């Protein structure tokens, strides 16, 4: 069999899936993605109010990660770009939303430079990691502009899951609520990008434990939060102490019961990250038709289309989900109870935000007011009070006349459960009746050539876990 080299896009997306899964499940292990010369930046300001500086080296990165107090961290990935870079490395850019400790989702952008580890082919570690929240860069806070955007942020997995995107070995490994299926959907069509001539990095740190699986070498995944650094020799001093730590704790043993017996997961420094890249994804279109029964592809395609056909107009929504429309103003990223909010429709197109706020201030203290002027008239918006009493007061005084002549369409904001119920009803009433489940289990790798599966992580730890 011919073993193909995984494309940068495939490497990047597999790394992203593994990285953010670990961020949710075991953030204290994230430092294993990095090496002695890795750099890491995770937004925020220092004590002087200036952008925080990068930290270098596995130990300092571990301290920095622990200082972030990542707890129950959930990530919605909206887009992943990956390109080949110098010395057979891969640069990965991630855009999405992140919620830490059950707080509101915040839009972020993160860039990784994955460098070859050196001891095994297709094994990488994170050489540079740069993370920024967009609200810190552009000022103010960005909230989900309206109900529709909340739906998209919270239910991405409802839209994209297809049988071919994630094979059994990876599908059983991570929680789709942690990493949005947007990323998985793109995995069906990775584009192999030309990689520059290899310029070997002699100083990469060898990891003996990773060499145990030579047929499918492991990509050394390097990390999630932020890093800025150019060339990096391999981390060597920490390797010995880390290997001892790795022998005492193995994620592979924890997750092995969930993995299919046919796909062995390499035992690396960061076994939890080492998940196989689906062999089907690099070039699904290149498989010879002669190897596939003549009628089955069409049937499978129809099934896939039915499963993916969750209203087509929802596809582009994630783009505007966090207030990306030019007319939507930046707003504070605070999640208020639905009982404190009102939907305001039929707003005059020239209405001023301060004028509207003063109008509703007569009913109670207005803590936030949003106007959506995306081009469709009349405009609409939301008013947020500090208590539910003003909301009921406004509703009981309907009809509400603005400027004495404009009747506003004032409604209580629907709860999330009500919105979800409406969506389910709409789907059940759609063409063809209720949809069948997506079930059937994930399909395994297709017939044809195989692709070497990347692995991530240097497998270096600090002291044994406490």
From Swiss-Prot:
There is a cross-link at residues 36, 50, 59, 64, 76, 123, 353, 357, 376, 393 (Glycyl lysine isopeptide (Lys-Gly) (interchain with G-Cter in ubiquitin)). It holds the Pfam family RRM_1. Protein involved in various processes, such as stress granule formation and innate immunity. Plays an essential role in stress granule formation. Stress granules are membraneless compartments that store mRNAs and proteins, such as stalled translation pre-initiation complexes, in response to stress. Promotes formation of stress granules phase-separated membraneless compartment by undergoing liquid-liquid phase separation (LLPS) upon unfolded RNA-binding: functions as a molecular switch that triggers RNA-dependent LLPS in response to a rise in intracellular free RNA concentrations. Residues 410-466 are annotated as: RG-rich region. Phosphorylation of the acidic disordered region regulates stress granule assembly. RASA1-dependent phosphorylation of Ser-149 induces a conformational change that prevents self-association. Dephosphorylation after HRAS activation is required for stress granule assembly. Ser-149 phosphorylation induces partial nuclear localization. Ubiquitinated by TRIM21 via 'Lys-63'-linked polyubiquitination in the NTF2 domain in response to heat shock, leading to stress granule disassembly: ubiquitination promotes interaction with the FAF2 adapter, followed by interaction with VCP, which extracts G3BP1 from stress granules, leading to stress granule disassembly. In case of prolonged stress, ubiquitination by TRIM21 leads to autophagy-dependent degradation of G3BP1 via recruitment of ubiquitinated G3BP1 by SQSTM1 and/or CALCOCO2 to autophagosomes. Residues 11-133 form the NTF2 domain. The keyword Plastid does not apply. Its cofactor is Mg(2+). Changing residue 357 to R: In 10KR; abolished ubiquitination in response to heat shock, leading to decreased stress granule disassembly. The keyword Transcription regulation does not apply. The record marks 325-326 as: Cleavage. It is found in: Cytoplasm, Cytosol; Perikaryon; Cytoplasm, Stress granule; Nucleus. Can mediate both protein-protein and protein-RNA interactions via the NTF2 domain and RNA-binding domain RRM; protein-protein and protein-RNA interactions are essential for undergoing liquid-liquid phase separation (LLPS). Residues 144-172, 184-243, 255-329, 413-466 are annotated as: Disordered. Changing residue 59 to R: In 10KR; abolished ubiquitination in response to heat shock, leading to decreased stress granule disassembly. In 6KR; strongly decreased ubiquitination in response to heat shock, leading to decreased stress granule disassembly. It catalyses: ATP + H2O = ADP + phosphate + H(+). Residues 340-415 form the RRM domain. This is Ras GTPase-activating protein-binding protein 1. The modification Dimethylated arginine is found at residues 435, 460. It comes from Homo sapiens. Residues 145-157, 185-206 have a biased composition (Acidic residues). Residues 297-307, 318-329, 413-428 have a biased composition (Basic and acidic residues). The modification Phosphoserine is found at residues 149, 231-232, 250, 253, 373. Changing residue 33 to W: Abolished interaction with CAPRIN1 and ability to undergo liquid-liquid phase separation. Abolished interaction with USP10.
């Amino acid at each position: 069999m011919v073993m193909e080299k995984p494309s940068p896009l495939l490497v990047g997306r597999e790394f992203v899936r593994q990285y953010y899964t670990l961020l949710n499940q075991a953030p204290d292990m994230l430092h294993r993605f990095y090496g002695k010369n890795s750099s890491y930046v995770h937004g925020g300001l220092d004590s002087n109010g200036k952008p925080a500086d990068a930290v270098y080296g596995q130990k300092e990165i571990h301290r920095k990660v622990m200082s972030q107090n990542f707890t129950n961290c959930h990530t919605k990935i909206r887009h992943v770009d990956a390109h080949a870079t110098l010395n057979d490395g891969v640069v990965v850019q991630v855009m999405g939303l992140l919620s830490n400790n059950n707080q509101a989702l915040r839009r972020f952008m993160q860039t990784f430079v994955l460098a070859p580890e050196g001891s095994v082919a297709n094994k990488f570690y994170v050489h540079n990691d740069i993370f920024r929240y967009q609200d810190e860069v552009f000022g103010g806070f960005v909230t989900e502009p309206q109900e529709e955007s909340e739906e998209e942020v919270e239910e991405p997995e409802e839209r994209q899951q297809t049988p071919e995107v994630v094979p059994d070995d990876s599908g059983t490994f991570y929680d789709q609520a942690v990493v949005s299926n947007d990323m998985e959907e793109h995995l069906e069509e990775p584009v192999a990008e030309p990689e520059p001539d290899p310029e070997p990095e002699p100083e990469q740190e060898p990891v003996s434990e990773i060499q145990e699986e030579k047929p499918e070498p492991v990509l050394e995944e390097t990390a999630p939060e932020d890093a800025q650094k150019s060339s990096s020799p391999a981390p060597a001093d920490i390797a010995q102490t880390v290997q001892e730590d790795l022998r005492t704790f193995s994620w592979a043993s924890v997750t092995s019961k969930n993995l299919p017996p046919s796909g062995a997961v390499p035992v690396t420094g960061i076994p939890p990250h080492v998940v196989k890249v689906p062999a089907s994804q690099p070039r699904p279109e290149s498989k010879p038709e002669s190897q596939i029964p003549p009628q089955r592809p069409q049937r499978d395609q129809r099934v896939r289309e039915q499963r993916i056909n969750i209203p087509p107009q929802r596809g582009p929504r994630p783009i505007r989900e966090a207030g990306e429309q030019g007319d939507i103003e930046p707003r504070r990223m605070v999640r208020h109870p639905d009982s404190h909010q009102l939907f305001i429709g039929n707003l005059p197109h020239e209405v001023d935000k301060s004028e509207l706020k003063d109008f509703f201030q007569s009913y109670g203290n207005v803590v936030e007011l949003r106007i959506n002027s995306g081009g469709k008239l009349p405009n609409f918006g939301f008013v947020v009070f500090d208590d539910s009493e003003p909301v009921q007061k406004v509703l009981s005084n309907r009809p509400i006349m603005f400027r004495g002549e404009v009747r506003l369409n004032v409604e209580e904001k629907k709860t999330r459960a009500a919105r979800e119920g409406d969506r389910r009803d709409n789907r059940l009433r759609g063409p063809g009746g209720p949809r069948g489940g997506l079930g059937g289990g994930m399909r395994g790798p297709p017939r044809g050539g195989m692709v070497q599966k990347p692995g991530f992580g240097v497998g270096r730890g600090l002291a044994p876990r406490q």
